[in-house]
UniProtKB/Swiss-Prot annotation:
Keyword Repeat annotated: yes
GO annotations of cellular component type: nucleus
UniProt protein name: Zinc finger protein 691
Compartments (UniProt record): Nucleus
């Protein structure tokens, strides 16, 4: 009598294909080479038609006659025939993925940002970006320029800065001797000396020294401001203005003066402050010739001349 006995594994059941001979028994009634004490063998039913053995239904633990399929194994046996050709004495392991069973995998969401800054609550999708951001709060600036010693919190900012040392500045202002890499930058700078603001907004009348600045301003009249502060509800027409404003809520001051250590949230104020150390006063009043380090101070000063002129006209 032969028996096809399924055994269990961690993946799926193992099936014996082909006949299996019963091992001869020793004089003590145990199989050769096995343990001496064996559990009593279950009672086997008589052989079915053609001398074929009955088999154990693995799912229910009952005996089934030859020729019939086990419960729930109709599709399994078909797949075994297709993917695993029958060979005598071959054990076939059927894995769940071979049968097309779904295997759950954790999904990675592209917009998931599980790393949170403990200082301001901003979220990031990886620890590297979080560490770079946290340098704003800690003031850490590990990337140092080899030419001038200036330090930066990001390596990309240091690389951008080092290009300044590599590029020559051919265009020099005759008024203050400041040099520029592009002629257009020199022209814009000279307009500041003259107090000229040739680009005027046709809606509100505000004037600007650069056409690009006028274009940014003009959008505030024509388009709804798309950048809205979630803290106070104030809206802005461009991301740079929104970024400067948002730092007033977070307290971030990423621009640090290397001379005195003073920090600023706005790069324009930072640039104006640095002129005080260099003694630069590029903004000149065309009426009295007085110079200023900030364009806003020049405009405020020029209003005094307009007031004097208005007083003369009234008298």
């Amino acid at each position: 009598m032969s028996l096809c006995s399924p055994t269990h594994s961690a993946e799926m059941s193992l099936f014996l294909q082909g006949p299996e001979e019963m091992l001869p028994l020793s004089s003590e009634g145990s199989e050769m080479g096995s343990e001496k004490e064996q559990s009593p063998e279950p009672h086997l039913p008589e052989e079915g038609e053609g001398g074929k053995p009955w088999r154990v239904d693995d799912s229910e633990g009952s005996w089934i006659p030859p020729g019939e399929k086990e419960h729930g194994q109709e599709s399994l046996s078909d797949e075994l025939q297709e993917t695993h050709p029958k060979k005598p004495w071959q054990k076939v392991t059927v894995r769940a993925r071979e049968l097309g069973d779904p295997i759950a995998h954790p999904r990675h969401e592209a917009d998931e940002k599980p790393f949170i800054c403990a200082q301001c609550g901003k979220t990031f999708n990886n620890t590297s970006n979080l560490r770079t951001h946290q340098r704003i709060h800690t003031g850490e600036k590990p990337y140092k320029c080899s030419e001038c010693g200036k330090s930066f919190s990001r390596s990309s900012n240091r690389i951008r800065h080092e290009r300044i040392h590599l590029e020559e500045k051919h265009y020099k202002c005759p008024k203050c001797q400041e040099s520029f890499r592009r002629r257009s930058d020199l022209t814009t700078h000279q307009q500041d000396h003259l107090g000229k603001r040739p680009y005027r907004c046709d809606i509100c009348g505000k004037s600007f020294s650069q056409s690009a600045t006028l274009a940014v301003h003009h959008r505030t009249h024509l388009e709804p401001a798309p950048y809205i502060c979630c803290e106070c509800g104030k809206s802005f027409s461009n991301s740079s203005s929104f970024g400067v404003h948002h730092r007033t809520h977070t307290g971030e001051r990423p621009y640090e003066c290397t001379e005195c250590g003073r920090t600023f949230s706005d790069i324009s104020n930072f640039g104006a402050h640095q002129r005080t150390h260099r003694g630069e006063k590029p903004y000149r009043c065309t009426v009295c010739g007085k110079h200023f380090s900030r364009s806003s101070n020049l405009i405020r000063h020029q209003k005094t001349h307009l007031g004097e002129q208005a007083g003369k006209d009234s008298s």
